[in-house]
Amino acid sequence: MAGKARVHELAKELGVTSKEVLARLSEQGEFVKSASSTVEAPVARRLRESFGGGKSAPAKGSDTGAAKGVAKAPQKVSGASPAAKAPDRSLDAALDKAVGNGAPAPVPAPAPAPTPAPAPAQPADSGVAPPAATPAAPAASAAPAPPKAPLPGQRPAPTPGKPAAPQAPHPGMAPGARPGPVPKQGVRTPRVGNNPFSSAQPVDRPIPRPQAPRPGAPRPGAPRPGGASSGNMPPRPGGASGGPRPPRTGAPRPGGGRPGGPGGGRSDGGGGNYRGGGGGVGAAPGGGFRGRPGGGGGGGRPGQRGGAAGAFGRPGGAPRRGRKSKRAKRAEYENMQAPVVGGVRLPHGNGETIRLARGASLSDFADKINANPAALVQALFNLGEMVTATQSVGDETLELLGSEMNYNVQVVSPEDEDRELLESFDLTYGEDSGDESELQTRPPVVTVMGHVDHGKTRLLDTIRKANVREGEAGGITQHIGAYQVSVDHDGTERLITFIDTPGHEAFTAMRARGAKATDIAILVVAADDGVMPQTVEAINHAQAADVPIVVAVNKIDKEGADPAKIRGQLTEYGLVAEDFGGDTMFVDISAKQGTNIEALEEAVLLTADAALDLRANPDMEAQGVAIEAHLDRGRGPVATVLVQRGTLRVGDSVVAGDAYGRVRRMVDEHGEDVEEALPSRPVQVIGFTSVPGAGDNFLVVDEDRIARQIADRRSARKRNALAARSRKRISLEDLDSALKETSQLNLILKGDNAGTVEALEEALMGIEVDDEVALRVIDRGVGGITETNVNLASASDAIIIGFNVRAEGKATELANREGVEIRYYSVIYQAIDEIEKALRGMLKPIYEEVELGRAEIRALFRSSKVGLIAGCMISSGVVRRNAKARLLRDNIVVVENLSIRSLRREKDDVTEVREGFECGMTLGYSDLKEGDFIESYELVQKDRS
């Protein structure tokens, strides 16, 4: 504790008991609890003064006596002035004035070098203590040199604590100044040391002695003059260590002399092993406690004023610059070698491959290469790409950024990522387990494809002996239907699974899913219509999936049917009939009349037996594909799945895409419950926690926990991919146009099936109207319109599109109250047409200027009611009231965008005046002259198609 002392230490120092000290403190108005309590330095000083300077005990040993003699030498020197023993009130006043009021004290002239003879006394009211006398050893020891007498006005230094060993003196010894260089002219007022309770003033540094040995060695055990000074006592120059260092020249030493040491320089500034003292004349005050960084460079340039840094342990001064470690040098070298991308230094790769998922962010990329995401963001910004650290980034941007840093960025496809995900759970998809002996024959899966209204569903109705077509809105198929029928082939009952796909152009994804999940494709072509666009698309899907095609030429019973023409047209697309020497089977049928249906079934079975190896392992865990899914109000999420391998049973834990659950019930196409589904069997599965996506692969896992983890990871991947796809890239060049006001139509899509919603969204997003309007689907889902959808639409100004669904509960009432528009559709192309019209209606109108007529100003009249009236003659065309006008003077436009406020013919208000008539009009403009022309026009909105 700097400046503080305990009561028992003071009692021991003064030679009295602790009770006497406590009593004396109580008389002085100081409340002290016990002998172990501490008192402040001013209180200790007044206590010593009240005891008459203290009663010092004689030295009991050589070592201890030497230490005490150093501290109390000014009191024992013979011939000292009596003023040295009495309290110096003038010195206290000078100290209070210097510390409290900040007034500079007068600077004495530099003192000469100290000599063994006593120094002449100076006036006590000078305000600055002269250089401290060199302490002498006690009388019991042989002093090496005669001691100096204390100067007049010098106060005895307090020693609050018991002196320690000679090598580590007590921190309470009297402050002083070390010898230093002679101060230059213009020296500033020395500042008080860091101890605000000290009664001593900083002194001028005496001129250092020449380096020479003192006559007489110091007593053994005494403090070494050349070592660390005792507290703030000024050390003797020279000594056993070979004399003091020569005074430094040049810039002052910043901070503490040694790391962790107190303030001051090593040998030419104030400070010691404990509390730092004044660093000499003009030096910054040392300070701080031991172990803390001190401030104030000792031995600084004379006249330099120290700061408060370093006082009371506060860090001060500049840090010492050390050598760089090898690691720091290597990091600096690597930073210099790093590539600069967009003005930012980034890590330099060695050509290694970085695998990133589609829709990854810059944070994901930075984690892979151990870089700072902020640096990647800044680099892309300087390259003209504005992306945040957590925003999904496109594949091209990631690859470009990686190539600049010498990394080979590979964006993992969704299929590869899903395969890696399943492999992490020791699962595989798409392969039959077991050997060849475990494989059994399965029924063929046949997909019926073709153009809209060519009779696909009627053909399936004829085969199934049902009427599905009448139940479809608009007479067109808008879902994928899966059925399994039994046919008689050569006296043997065979099963065939049929999948019906939509033929409308909006259902491209459905047809693609049907082609991937099938073994054989039946291409239905109307004999009276020929090959149409969706026919060509169906051919492309089947050929891309490497699926054999059987062509069914339908409607041969209608007028104008020409099956030969169909065969010729399909030849252009690689489908050559067997009649023409090809390998594609053609069957002429009539689905309405039921003609040649058995021949078509036989052609399908022959193709399956001849070209395909239709076998699967029924004993493994089931795998397949979800062809369709919807949300049933009473049963919850329902998925139509096609088992491709294995056997699906009630109670199995399944995962399909980002949906999972346990099979609670299975229903076939006739609505009957099924306990198990063998390969190639389509069933409706009830028990999913959410609606699976159409076309998602499903598989059976061991437990629900694994299914949930797989579904959660797929859901996160789906969100990232969707965010990357929907994010509109904005470059700095396009920033101006991006900031312009654009109209956006927000939609919420709800449908009865997942595939229908997907097809509707893709069709709507394909509408191209203009860059000024944009279409955004903010939410999509399967099932009825709920209050949550209405609240979201109200918050985002969206329109709700319901496809084959209605509003549930109080959703309609809430929509009416919130002003949310709900549109219901049952035919997909009606929804597409109306949304396209709505987008066109949101376009900003384009106005075209149509000139009406010109009028010449013949006279001007002023009216106190209406202002300036122009008497005009209509020279051409017609002038209408409230029409736009511009003023022409010498065929130069004077002012634009005027309005004809009033129009009169004689005394009657009129709406228009034709050519050859006079009239009076007001324009709300006063700078009119005779001879000016008024040109009238109107803006007509132009239709934007």
Curated annotation (Swiss-Prot):
Residues 320-329 have a biased composition (Basic residues). GTP binds at residues 450-457, 500-504, 554-557. Residues 475-479 are annotated as: G2. Residues 105-121, 144-169, 208-223 have a biased composition (Pro residues). Its main location: cytoplasm. GO terms for cellular component: cytosol. Residues 450-457 are annotated as: G1. CDD domains: IF2_eIF5B, IF2_mtIF2_II, mtIF2_IVc. Residues 129-143 have a biased composition (Low complexity). Residues 441-612 form the tr-type G domain. Keywords: Cytoplasm, GTP-binding, Initiation factor, Nucleotide-binding, Protein biosynthesis. Residues 500-503 are annotated as: G3. Residues 47-330 are annotated as: Disordered. Residues 554-557 are annotated as: G4. One of its GO terms (molecular function) is GTP binding. InterPro entries: EF-G-like_DII, IF2_II, IF2_N, P-loop_NTPase, Small_GTP-bd, T_Tr_GTP-bd_dom, TF_IF2_bacterial-like, TIF_IF2. It comes from the Bacteria. Residues 253-316 have a biased composition (Gly residues). It is found in: Cytoplasm. Residues 86-95 have a biased composition (Basic and acidic residues). Residues 590-592 are annotated as: G5. Belongs to the TRAFAC class translation factor GTPase superfamily. Classic translation factor GTPase family. IF-2 subfamily. HAMAP family: IF_2_B. NCBIfam families: IF-2, small_GTP. One of the essential components for the initiation of protein synthesis. Protects formylmethionyl-tRNA from spontaneous hydrolysis and promotes its binding to the 30S ribosomal subunits. Also involved in the hydrolysis of GTP during the formation of the 70S ribosomal complex. This is Translation initiation factor IF-2. It comes from Mycobacterium ulcerans (strain Agy99).
